């Protein structure tokens, strides 16, 4: 009978460092040259997330409307030129940052760069396009707000940070009625500037490609007035139930306010979260799905922002088993606080985390994503090896100690949206 080979965690990981260039306006450009890939991916990361907006929805509207017409190109022309050359662009926005990413074949980078220049530097935000966008998003949000999952997610953010905190605030769909071109243009002018931007490029970054990227980046204007974002204190609530008549399922969010990625306990807490609910065979999945059949899926994860972070557990269960599901989640947390994780389980989790790191870093795009995350946290790519080493050194005793320290029931926030009648 063949034996399974022993599980081993890599002792180190070699990730290329990004080469740093500085545009004439001071914006940093981080280049990861992988000439064997005949593609170029270019990301502009602006400190222009929702915490920086002065009016509801202007941060997301600004990012999403960059390609809806420029000084020289209509939205249709932008889309057609990208499509013709097999290029694409993607928009992502979170509480802190907006990420504008373009990807093209190396041989078609120049015509793609023409579009990039228009989208990043010369958007027009026409009133007509804004009205169409606002109406569509208002309807989408109204539909989303009927779902218990959306209700629980938004209420959980408010419970963790406070209803008026930029990380917790949620606007009603009616706020889209006040969205206007003037406010979007104002947000763009304040936040899409040289001081608020970093650029990360990966793939076949030849001298010619780099020169073109620098020429575009150099045109970003300087910030007219320096801004310091001052975040208010957190106001945490611990137990919230939201009645949603007719709901067949309850959406559960549980967790607590913690810390950013730079905290010394962040990586071992990632290991703890993985054990608890971070993969298909995790404790919460085994209990609530496999043993009790309460849900199709449940997960836990460490969520991080620039200035804060939290642990989140999320699932949806039938309304009739809501209380039983909450009891089982509490039971698994209590077990982590009182019993040691077996060496076999801990080794499995460590290997899965190491394997996921290897998978993400297999190619220039994944390396670019990790590089971006490291830059925003103040690290370079040597931090990846440090994280892997920290995962390897995490012990069962440390997991139990962290659970006792951070998963005290009195500190946990629980939000449930469903029909309790």
Give the location of each predicted region.
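His/Glu-rich zincin catalytic helix
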Residues: 1-80, 185-287, 326, 330, ...
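Charge-rich, well-structured scaffold segments of protease-associated domains
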Residues: 1-3, 22, 77-225, 231, ...
